[in-house]
Amino acid sequence: LLSIVAASMTLAACNAQSGYKVTGTIEGMPDGKAFIANFDGTKLDTLAKSDITNGAFEFTGKVSEPTGAFIMVVGQRFSLPIMLENANITVNAGQAGLNVTGSEGQKIYDQFMALNMSIQQEQQKLMPEFQAANQAGDQAKMQEIQDQFQKVVEAAQAKEAELIKANPDSYVSTFVIVSGMGQMEYEQLKEKYSLLGEKAKATAHGKAIAAQIAKLESTAIGQIAPNFTVTTPEGESISLYDIKGK
């Protein structure tokens, strides 16, 4: 009996280390080529390739460490974020949204994405008001809307920081930071990096964040607030920063 149990445990361990299999469908996607790519903050590294037939795809491979990655389609401006681990992962994308299962890290990532969604929803809600104020030439109202949106962003950023604190050594936390660090100023990025544990800092994404901090350090400036840009009836683009500069 002990030998059977030992053999079963050995088999389970081997299966856990065997690699990943990512299967799924993208609704409405024409036949073509797809690939999984890792993003280190500056460039994409292709990890696996697959044909897409009737919207279906299958990737297989192995990662040395769990990582955030993107499913991308050749010739399409299209990407699906997934938390890639050596496991069986299912991906379904369509009008109803993106659903990824099989990856433990995905559960954490979905919490981060819920925060992003709250910002996007608020922006969509405020944009018509901002456009109306712009057309009316009401700069005070435009500033009021911008301030309201900024509060939403700051609240979401505070919740994001709490999530990173709750998952300091998760590769998901480093992936979230890497994905957005191109829009971060020095102090903001440094603060997020400080929330990571040593294990996370030692990952490829953790090292990429450290490299970006070093790059920004010599030209550090204050954090830039989110901006609204709209088109005037005359066809000119105008943003909040244009207004502030007048």
Language-model-detected regions and their locations in the chain:
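Bacterial N-terminal signal peptides that target proteins for export
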Residues: 1-2
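Loop/turn elements at helix/coil->beta-strand transitions in domains of secreted/extracellular proteins
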Residues: 245-246
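N-terminal "domain-start" segment that seeds a small globular fold
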Residues: 207-242
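A non-transmembrane, solvent-exposed segment enriched in polar/low-complexity residues
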Residues: 14-158
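N-terminal targeting signals for export/organelle localization
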Residues: 14, 77-79, 99, 106, ...
